Each structure stands twice: as structure tokens, then as C-alpha cells.
């Protein structure tokens, strides 16, 4: 996804042919293909359902690069939306499985990613997508804190548990699904997330994000095995990009150089001390207290 997004960025600026040789571009056209992990019937190949968002993004960028028509992206988007409706319905959260009830960080984050990918590729999020995005915002707001700490449960968290907030909140700010006060507080919290990234997650000696234990690469801010040491370079690129592109959105919205709202700490005291968010109801109810 990141590779093809960069190619699209170059293409949009009229620089692609100058930056990438034709033979390299031909190779990338074959390799950067959503079909490598999606079957012809649009089922994923041994991957959790958040990868539908990745597949849609790649298909949409391939279309904008002139590599394929729009039909695959449209079908993958419809598949994602149908998944929401089928397994969460009115509650608006993504089951990571086909109805087995695994709701974690991705369940809240995915709608933010979908909204961003729609906007990045020239599409308009539907009212339904905006409503689901607002539900994710409602879950995140009571979790705001002074230290920029994000999700503490679910798979593949670590620093990604923090950046999940950045992506959902900036999508919500772009689509105006928050109140002006909520938007200011979202910016204040996002600033704390980025400060935590630099002060806690980045190892000052190596200059690398620190996820891999007491090695050359850090002092032990551990995550799960999914993000093993083989992914050191990729995780640094991925995380840096998340902070850079979400900061660029805040800049576009008028927050460039702005000091976070001084009333943030007082505002935290107005938040509910406990909430109940339903993910799905049925034979087995799923929710988050």
C-alpha cells in the first residue's frame, strides 16, 4: 500500500515517469497487486478482515494509475461495507473475523482508514461511513488522557495503539463529524500522541522506533510477534508516515503551529468515568466497558 501510494503521489504531480524507470514500473505493476492476497471470489487469503481496506486502497490506486478499471475497487469497497452491516450493523464496528466476534483496535480504526483512503483517492464517504466514524469517535473520546497513550488491549498494539487515534481523529476532523470543542481536544490529544512517539517509542541511540527488546534496536518497548525484527525498516517508515500525514491534515485544518488547547486537562474531567459500547448483539453479545 505505501509503495503504490507513493507512486500515485508522484503520478499526481506529473513526476512518475521521471522518477521511476519503465522497466521498474512494469515490475511494480505486477507486484503491487491486491490479487496477491485476495482470491477471485474476493475472500482474503488467510488474513484478518482489516486487509479488505488494504486491498481496496491498492485497487483504487491501480485504477488512478491507469493499471486497471474501477470495478475491483468498487467491489472491494462494497465487500467491506457489507461486512460492517452483516456483523455489527447499527453498532458500526468491524469484526476481524467472519462473524466470530473478534473486536479489537482494528475494529475501531478501520472505518477511519476507509474514510482516509476514500478521500485520498477522490471519493466521497457516504453518510453511513460518517455515522460509523462518529461511533469510533464516541469510543475514543473517553479514552483521552494527558500522556498520549492509546489502546492497551488487542493484537498488534504497541505504538500502533497510539497512532490508531491519530487516523480516526483526523478523518473525523476532515469530515466534520466532531463538534468544534471535540476537534480542538482531538488536536490536543494528537499532539500528545506524537510527543509520546518521540519521547517514549523512539530510541535516541539508534534513531529507530523501539519495539524489539534489548537489541541493537532498542531497550524493550515490546509489541507482539506479528511485528518481528524483520520488519524494523518497514515499521519505521509506516509509523513516521502516519505521524507526518495526520499532522499535515491538522495543518490543512488551520492548526499549523498552534499550541494545544490549554483547557485540555480540565476538559478531561468532564468526560464520563465509564462507558458501554456495543460491538454486536446476538447469541453472544460483544462490547467494551
Task: List the model feature ranges, each with a label.
Residues 1-176:
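Aromatic-lined, polymer-binding surfaces characteristic
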Residues 146, 166, 170-289:
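Extended polysaccharide-engagement surfaces of secreted carbohydrate-active enzymes
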Amino acid at each position: 500500500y505505501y509503495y503504490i501510494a507513493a507512486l500515485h503521489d508522484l503520478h499526481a504531480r506529473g513526476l512518475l515517469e521521471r522518477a521511476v524507470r519503465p522497466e521498474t514500473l512494469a515490475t511494480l505493476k505486477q507486484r503491487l497487486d491486491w490479487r496477491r492476497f485476495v482470491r477471485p471470489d474476493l475472500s482474503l487469503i488467510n488474513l484478518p478482515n482489516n486487509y479488505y481496506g488494504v486491498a481496496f486502497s491498492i485497487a483504487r490506486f491501480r485504477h488512478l494509475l491507469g493499471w486497471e478499471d474501477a470495478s475491483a475497487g468498487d467491489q472491494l469497497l462494497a465487500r467491506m461495507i457489507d461486512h460492517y452491516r452483516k456483523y455489527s450493523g447499527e453498532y458500526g464496528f468491524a469484526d476481524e473475523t467472519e462473524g466470530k466476534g473478534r473486536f479489537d483496535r482494528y475494529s475501531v480504526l478501520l472505518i477511519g482508514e476507509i474514510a482516509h483512503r476514500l478521500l485520498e483517492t477522490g471519493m466521497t464517504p457516504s453518510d453511513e461511513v460518517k455515522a460509523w466514524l462518529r461511533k469510533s469517535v464516541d469510543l475514543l473520546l473517553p479514552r483521552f488522557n494527558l500522556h498520549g497513550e492509546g489502546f492497551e488491549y488487542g493484537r498488534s498494539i504497541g505504538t500502533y495503539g497510539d497512532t490508531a487515534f491519530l487516523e480516526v481523529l483526523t478523518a473525523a476532523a476532515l469530515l466534520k463529524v466532531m463538534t468544534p470543542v471535540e476537534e480542538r481536544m482531538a488536536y490536543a490529544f494528537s499532539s500528545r500522541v506524537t510527543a509520546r512517539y518521540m519521547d517514549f517509542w523512539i530510541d535516541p541511540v539508534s534513531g529507530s522506533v523501539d519495539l524489539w527488546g534489548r537489541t541493537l534496536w532498542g531497550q524493550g518497548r515490546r509489541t507482539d510477534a506479528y511485528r518481528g525484527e524483520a520488519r524494523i525498516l518497514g515499521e519505521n517508515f509506516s509509523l513516521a508516515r502516519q505521524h507526518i500525514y495526520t499532522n499535515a491534515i491538522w495543518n490543512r485544518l488551520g492548526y499549523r503551529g498552534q499550541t494545544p488547547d490549554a483547557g485540555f486537562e480540565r476538559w478531561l474531567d468532564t468526560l464520563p468515568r465509564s462507558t458501554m459500547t456495543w460491538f454486536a448483539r446476538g447469541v453472544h453479545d460483544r462490547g467494551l466497558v
